[in-house]
Amino acid sequence: MAVSLWQQCIGRLQDELSAQQFSMWIRPLQAEMDGDTLVLYAPNRFVLDWVRDKYINIINQFFTEQMGNDAPKLRFDIGSRPSAKKPEPAPVAAVRVPNPQTKASVGTSFNTTEPVANTNHRSNINPTYQFDNFVEGKSNQLGKAAALQVAENPGGAYNPLFLYGGTGLGKTHLLHAVGNGIIKNNPNAKVVYMHSERFVQDMVKALQNNAIEEFKRYYRSVDALFIDDIQFFANKDRSQEEFFHTFNALLEGNHQIILTSDRYPKEIDGVEDRLKSRFGWGLTVAIEPPELETRVAILMRKAQESGINLPDEVAFFIAKRLRSNVRELEGALNRVIANANFTGRPITIDFVREALRDLLALQEKLVTIDNIQKTVAEYYKIKMADMLSKRRSRSVARPRQVAMALSKELTNQSLPEIGDAFGGRDHTTVLHACRKIAQLREESHDIKEDYANLIRTLSS
């Protein structure tokens, strides 16, 4: 009875939550009765904590509405429900493809004299990219959680997994981390990572060498295929055709696919609608630019790995001024470390100002409140005067709140200074706007997309 009630509760949650929230947090749960208690099994600690924190009140309220005082007790656990557990399957009879940088090779199904056969010696999974050294924050926690679940259960609920976001935000790191996780759990797994251009090149070589059937057999036999920057398939009709059939074959065999792009699937121009539709069959997750706390954590982790003692105030100084992506942060820190090693000077704020003066000057020039206001007004198609006016209609108030939140995140101005720039508003109005937009970014896919697009525009 209670398990049936849980199925009804799932229907309620599916109506109330966004498709991404439902796929991410509710779909992986399994339910089973234990006496008078309904046990919900989550695949890992992250999902368990999130559901218990965000959704337990909704679940309990539904149970009470349906059964009153007879509603079952609720308990959470990690793993699969006992009745669902099955004997471990035999290891996959497949070949792990070594990194091309290593000299070792294993048996192949291709004739290695053929150019296309090079695919047989390339997993390209970088062992240095692990979940343990991926710095997590609000901007990427959904992506990491999804990647962890795929690593634990490849070919399961999130297939395909589609990660999108700007350059240098950690999408590639997560791809490799998943690959390393899969190989750790099953050393025989055939996991292949590549850039989309490499897939195109391999197909062209196969056509030139009359080896297209071998090409098809290879790509359709892998246990997991990870393709970076799928947007480069744009306007390559033959490549899209071949990938379409490869995609279908892998999904039919429950083999994992992970794709990345710099934009939301439906916004990729030059890619067939049937492919874009399939990209959204599993789970689509945005990887956003890191917020201040995450940027600081990235700098501290990188400095620690380099054996450098980076003072907290210096990390905050850099993180507050360089905001666009992880790659830029790491590049800036590498420059600071190199300068410090060369000159023998201690790493202070004044030293960093000098070492990064060109980068800092460029950032300060690019991102101003005025620039943010103009960009947001143009994006939402409202007048600049409306941004500063007292109008409270949603069509004006929401863009104004977005612009205030962006001003807090992307500039070094204080809340009172931001308020002054928006028509002399009080700092509490700015604070409310920032909190409101932060809430909406979790609840509304459209606001989340708008905010990410605006950050990309302002940071480019």
Curated annotation (Swiss-Prot):
ATP binds at residues 168, 170-172. Residues 84-123 are annotated as: Domain II. InterPro entries: AAA+_ATPase, Chromosome_initiator_DnaA, Chromosome_initiator_DnaA-like, Chromosome_initiator_DnaA_CS, DnaA_C, DnaA_dom, DnaA_N_dom, DnaA_N_sf. Its main location: cytoplasm. SMART domains: AAA (SM00382), Bac_DnaA_C (SM00760). Keywords: ATP-binding, Cytoplasm, DNA replication, DNA-binding, Lipid-binding, Nucleotide-binding. One of its GO terms (molecular function) is DNA replication origin binding. Residues 103-123 are annotated as: Disordered. Residues 124-340 are annotated as: Domain III, AAA+ region. GO terms for cellular component: cytoplasm; plasma membrane. Pfam families: Bac_DnaA, Bac_DnaA_C, DnaA_N, Hda_lid. It comes from the Bacteria. Residues 341-460 are annotated as: Domain IV, binds dsDNA. Gene3D superfamilies: 1.10.1750.10, 1.10.8.60, 3.30.300.180, P-loop containing nucleotide triphosphate hydrolases. GO terms for biological process: DNA replication initiation; regulation of DNA replication. It is found in: Cytoplasm. SUPFAM superfamilies: P-loop containing nucleoside triphosphate hydrolases, TrpR-like. Residues 1-84 are annotated as: Domain I, interacts with DnaA modulators. Oligomerizes as a right-handed, spiral filament on DNA at oriC. Plays an essential role in the initiation and regulation of chromosomal replication. ATP-DnaA binds to the origin of replication (oriC) to initiate formation of the DNA replication initiation complex once per cell cycle. Binds the DnaA box (a 9 base pair repeat at the origin) and separates the double-stranded (ds)DNA. Forms a right-handed helical filament on oriC DNA; dsDNA binds to the exterior of the filament while single-stranded (ss)DNA is stabiized in the filament's interior. Belongs to the DnaA family. Domain I is involved in oligomerization and binding regulators, domain II is flexibile and of varying length in different bacteria, domain III forms the AAA+ region, while domain IV binds dsDNA. This is Chromosomal replication initiator protein DnaA.
